[in-house]
């Protein structure tokens, strides 16, 4: 058997053309130029690395330890132990003094006026008012006072005044 004949080969598979010295030099320069741009910027080791690439952020990234103005003790000194002061407790007021304080409380008066005007208070304000009014009731019970006593005194005074008018007018 005979082998089939193949088509003639093109010149591409034949001898390759050799590059001239100038072409080789030019390719080498191009490769060197590309290689130069790899790696870190010159002086980055001494400058701190990121400062070369982000020049605008130097003020924000300053180390706070550099340039500190606080004095540093140079010798060995004994530690000064500060004595812990216990928190002073609020002095206990007498029930009468506490009641007077609550009755003259400006915030409580303002909130009560708003309630009487028909406004609705926030939950915090309403809770605060309720707590203060409850405390006033407790103090009045401790002291033996009540709202009714004041009203009865007023009624008695009015009755006496009416009696005096009648007596004077009747003469």
Curated annotation (Swiss-Prot):
Domain of life assignment: Bacteria
InterPro entries: YihI (IPR007336)
Entry keywords, A to Z: GTPase activation, Ribosome biogenesis
Compositional bias (Basic and acidic residues): 20-30
Single GO MF descriptor: GTPase activator activity
Coiled coil regions, renumbered to chain: none
Transmembrane annotation, as ranges: none
Residue span of region Disordered: 1-99, 145-171
GO biological process: ribosome biogenesis
Subunit structure: Interacts with Der.
Name of protein: Der GTPase-activating protein YihI
Organism whose genome encodes this protein: Salmonella typhimurium (strain LT2 / SGSC1412 / ATCC 700720)
């Amino acid at each position: 058997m005979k082998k089939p004949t193949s088509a003639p080969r093109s010149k591409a598979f034949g001898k390759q053309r050799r590059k001239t010295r100038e072409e080789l030099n030019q390719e080498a320069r191009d490769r060197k130029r590309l290689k130069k741009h790899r790696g870190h910027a010159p002086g980055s080791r001494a400058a701190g690395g990121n400062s070369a690439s982000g020049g605008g952020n130097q003020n924000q990234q300053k180390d706070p330890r550099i340039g500190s103005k606080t004095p540093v003790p140079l010798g060995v000194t004994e530690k000064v132990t500060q004595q812990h002061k216990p928190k002073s407790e609020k002095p206990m007021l007498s029930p009468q003094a506490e009641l007077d304080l609550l009755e003259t409380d400006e915030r409580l008066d303002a909130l009560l006026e708003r309630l009487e005007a028909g406004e609705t208070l926030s939950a915090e304000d309403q809770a605060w008012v309720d707590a203060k009014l409850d405390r006033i009731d407790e103090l009045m019970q401790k002291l033996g006072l009540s709202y009714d006593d004041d009203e009865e005194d007023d009624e008695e005074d009015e009755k006496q005044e009416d009696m005096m008018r009648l007596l004077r007018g009747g003469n």
